[in-house]
Amino acid sequence: MLSNLRILLNKAALRKAHTSMVRNFRYGKPVQSQVQLKGRDLLTLKNFTGEEIQYMLWLSADLKFRIKQKGEYLPLLQGKSLGMIFEKRSTRTRLSTETGFALLGGHPSFLTTQDIHLGVNESLTDTARVLSSMTDAVLARVYKQSDLDILAKEATIPIVNGLSDLYHPIQILADYLTLQEHYGSLKGLTLSWIGDGNNILHSIMMSAAKFGMHLQAATPKGYEPDPNIVKLAEQYAKENGTRLSMTNDPLEAARGGNVLITDTWISMGQEDEKKKRLQAFQGYQVTMKTAKVAASDWTFLHCLPRKPEEVDDEVFYSPRSLVFPEAENRKWTIMAVMVSLLTDYSPVLQKPKF
């Protein structure tokens, strides 16, 4: 009987301890910030100021420090649910979002094209309204940016771009966090893009100048970035006193660059163009020859998955490659995005230098 009583008392103590932990997870004095992102959509970094993007990176560093380094339990998203709509397959976006949202106490629900067809079986308007009634936010990985725009217009909850034909903002946040950790600051860095004029490059163009970073981009003829995005990027560069150059010469783009960046040459949905693209991108592989004209402190980034024709093993697996630290940072940055859009949490960690 005494043994049963001890068991009951121990269970009660554990329940009390768990309740206390949940209620008191936000210890430490938060650092005050004027940035308020709660309730916003994240469709493109074009819609965010430099200060707002810095805040998301600051929050990423804060969560990484408190959870990974200090081992704290932070159920900031307890009771929250996330709808994840994926028209395109994914490893890092799906895994980082699912594990990150769950780590913060939330419940992610994954939907593929087998479960939901945007605008096919049901209008985007109706889908947005249904999701708004059942979840607290939606992360959508889609073929068309216009679908995200409609979802955001019709939904009453935050919509996050997990990738579209035009932008991939959450990837760029992970890139910037990784570079800040490595260099100690982003201001003054020169980013050298060598590859396709795609959604990754577009997202860099919508944000780099806001941090005081210069951009040198090389793309093959016929594969340049969207002209409207180039025009806006030129405006950002002028406003922030940074350089923006576009060329068809990979070595010209790499010259003096601190960060060599490339991506897949053949994105999902472009498989029929494989032969044509491989021919067009001849000479665009990032190698040590490319690195020789870069800055002495050069590093390398690739958002993955990677093919050998895009970057050789010598660069990809070198100590200069930040590819795998960046892949991990996908988790901390998407966690920060969700926390900033869904809660009033303020970072405890002192703001890093940007």
Curated annotation (Swiss-Prot):
It is found in: Mitochondrion matrix. Negatively regulated by lysine acetylation. SUPFAM superfamilies: Aspartate/ornithine carbamoyltransferase. GO terms for molecular function: amino acid binding; identical protein binding; ornithine carbamoyltransferase activity; phosphate ion binding; phospholipid binding. L-ornithine binds at N199, D263, S267, M268. One of its GO terms (cellular component) is mitochondrion. Carbamoyl phosphate binds at S90, T91, R92, T93, R141, H168, Q171, C303, L304, R330. One of its GO terms (biological process) is monoatomic anion homeostasis. Residues 1-32 form a transit peptide. It catalyses: carbamoyl phosphate + L-ornithine = L-citrulline + phosphate + H(+). The active site is at C303 (proton acceptor). Pathway: Nitrogen metabolism; urea cycle; L-citrulline from L-ornithine and carbamoyl phosphate: step 1/1. The modification N6-acetyllysine is found at K70, K88, K144, K221, K231, K238, K292, K307. Keywords: Acetylation, Amino-acid biosynthesis, Arginine biosynthesis, Mitochondrion, Phosphoprotein, Transferase, Transit peptide, Urea cycle. Acetylation at Lys-88 negatively regulates ornithine carbamoyltransferase activity in response to nutrient signals. The modification N6-succinyllysine is found at K70, K80, K88, K144, K221, K231, K238, K274, K289, K292, K307. Its EC number is 2.1.3.3. PROSITE patterns: CARBAMOYLTRANSFERASE (PS00097). InterPro entries: Asp/Orn_carbamoyltranf_P-bd, Asp/Orn_carbamoylTrfase, Asp/Orn_carbamoylTrfase_sf, Asp_carbamoyltransf_Asp/Orn-bd, Orn/put_carbamltrans. It comes from the Eukaryota. The modification Phosphoserine is found at S133. Belongs to the aspartate/ornithine carbamoyltransferase superfamily. OTCase family. Catalyzes the second step of the urea cycle, the condensation of carbamoyl phosphate with L-ornithine to form L-citrulline. The urea cycle ensures the detoxification of ammonia by converting it to urea for excretion. Homotrimer. This is Ornithine transcarbamylase, mitochondrial. It comes from Rattus norvegicus (Rat). The lineage of its organism: Eukaryota, Metazoa, Chordata, Craniata, Vertebrata.
